[in-house]
């Protein structure tokens, strides 16, 4: 197909949707035909940066600027909507979930002092570090093990916890517009409250006032349970069978550099199992690291669930259906994985250092216990017991 160059005048057709560590996501609000690949001018990107600045979280602006030297932009489907917009006038509600790691690590490479990792989820421990860094105002009660459990009751509890404290793990859209959750940062505040969704959901869920939120969670629970999509995600996450504490040695072995982890421990304290990893052929070391990075992507990706009411008697829809018993409604739904960028090899050291910080913060919070003069520590201790 022909490439289209976007100029400064075209920037007004693009609106801020969110961002991650490496990419900013914009929604196209213009009327041009379907676009797949576009060239962009420096002036277009400069104008985009000005247009979206007021919508970006402050900490994102400080962390990264738009690269105005890029010559092209990646266009992807907006999975918060069904294709061709709103079908037959029905409202579309979408839910983005970042489920995080759904299992407890079982690797024999986990150090004795970090054994807490085998009994406490990474998400729960990371909450403590984020709280200490003042990136979140309170600790989430969400447990990824509940969401991945295969139990409808536990899935419901997990989704309720996410809805009550979305952070950057839960977002709700109505017709493509964000109505619950932040714009993509751990410090974001929700744009609304769960209670305020009651009024919004009247366009989608035929329940009495005060019951729409309950019905919404029932719909989402049924869909997560029925789709089985988390089982597939968990299989990929479990490609990490060495944990970062093992994979880091394979990484240094592959790049043929002295291992900083072993150097910090001292030669007399390096375990035989770590020595074994440093003796592997490069291709085997690379395989360990590749699987770790693929699993890391699966642990950090998001799922987008999109719903619209199916018309009475409608049977020609190409989408799967889910029945909401409490309102006797049938919904079309579709599920997509998003944020599947493969993690770069160069981030291995960062992953190891972050892992150690997370475990250290959680262990210290447990050890300090109640009675300390630090109010934050007291609050942490009470929350994690």
Features from the language model and the residues they span:
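Polybasic, positively charged surfaces/segments
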Residues: 2-385
